[in-house]
């Protein structure tokens, strides 16, 4: 069932005015003014909104660090829409290859998919920064063509011990 909600004003403006930035529960506190700036990454993109949280694996990176990495190797970016499920604890009990996580959306551009596929074809290594990125790349791998597929997609995979990596 779909519910449509209409607002008298721009939803992004409304969220900025009355919303509160979600931060990881392990910080053990409410969001602070400083978090709006600090809890961003060098990969933040105001043109592609949609994340409920920053991909925390890259919080320590700054522009200078990223430039050094780009001088040493090829870098491609994908768009991650980190979902609210990232704040949920794992369910108690057995975790196995059938376990599914919360679903998160991502977008891989054609140029990023081409770079990744060329790297794989030439027996190069693909390094993922963070588990959300890793889940996206592994989910985007097509078993038939053995290529990473570009475009908007989503993932709910849970990578656990014994997982056979196809991209990274």
Task: Give residue spans per PLM region.
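Surface-exposed, charge/polar-rich loops and edge strands
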Residues: 1-168
């Amino acid at each position: 069932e779909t519910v449509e909600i209409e607002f008298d004003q721009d939803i992004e403006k409304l969220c900025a005015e009355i919303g509160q930035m979600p931060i990881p529960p392990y910080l053990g506190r409410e969001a602070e003014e400083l978090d709006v700036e600090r809890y961003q990454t060098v990969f933040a993109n105001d043109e592609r909104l949609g994340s409920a949280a920053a991909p925390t694996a890259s919080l320590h990176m700054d522009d200078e660090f990223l430039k050094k990495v780009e001088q040493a190797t090829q870098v491609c970016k994908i768009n991650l829409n980190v979902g609210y499920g990232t704040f949920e604890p794992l369910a108690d009990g057995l975790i196995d290859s059938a376990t599914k996580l919360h679903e998160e959306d991502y977008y891989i551009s054609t140029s990023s998919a081409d770079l990744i596929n060329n790297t794989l074809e030439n027996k190069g290594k693909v390094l993922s920064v963070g588990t959300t990125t890793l889940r996206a790349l592994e989910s985007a791998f097509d078993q038939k063509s053995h290529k990473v597929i570009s475009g908007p997609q989503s993932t709910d995979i849970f990578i656990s011990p014994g997982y056979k990596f196809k991209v990274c």
